[in-house]
Amino acid sequence: IAGYIITREYTDDTMKNISTIPISYRQLLSGKLLVLLLLTICFSFIGCVIALAINIIAGFSGVHFGNLFNLFIRVIGANIGIYISVLPIILLFCCSANNFLGGVALAFLYGYFGSFVGKLLNYYPIKASMILVDSACDAKYGVIYQISPACITIVLTFLISMIILA
């Protein structure tokens, strides 16, 4: 979705029309990234509502406000962290008309490697976003993650994104 939204001006050849508006490309891109963040939050919320509906329809026990609120916070928090983790890839590949597909492939691989288990993954941005919402996510495999390296990783990834955007 990010590549599609960001490259519309190039693929539809509307950049010349937009350039008459007194905003810089950086401001336009920042606005689109904000829309993508809001879409991330909305899709996270919709996913939680669907999960809630399935739980109620299936009659699973343990569906109460405390669990639901915890689910919503964790899912939305993890997805915002994943958004921040993928942001440098989005920014690096968004500047040309048809190059965003390479960014999609790279982001897929980048996310895939986040599914592995290991202590070094405290420093892997995709896994770090999940560690921030549940540091015991792989305790059953004997791996205990730490929140502070994960937090540092997410902050550094965000700072790298802001440097690329500047």
Regions picked out by a protein language model, each given a short descriptive name:
Residues 2, 13-15, 88, 125-128:
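Hydrophobic alpha-helical segments typical of transmembrane helices
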Residues 4, 48, 52, 90-91, ...:
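Transmembrane alpha-helix boundary and packing residues in multipass membrane permease domains
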Residues 52-64, 98-102, 123, 127, ...:
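Transmembrane helix-loop junctions in multipass membrane proteins, especially transporters and channels
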Residues 5-37:
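Helix-loop-helix units of permease transmembrane domains in multi-pass membrane transporters
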Residues 84-115:
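Functionally important transmembrane alpha-helices
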Residues 104-166:
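Terminal transmembrane helical anchor/hairpin motif
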Residues 1-12, 117-121:
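Transmembrane helix-boundary elements of multi-pass transport/secretion proteins
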Residues 1, 30-95, 141-143:
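Secretory targeting signals
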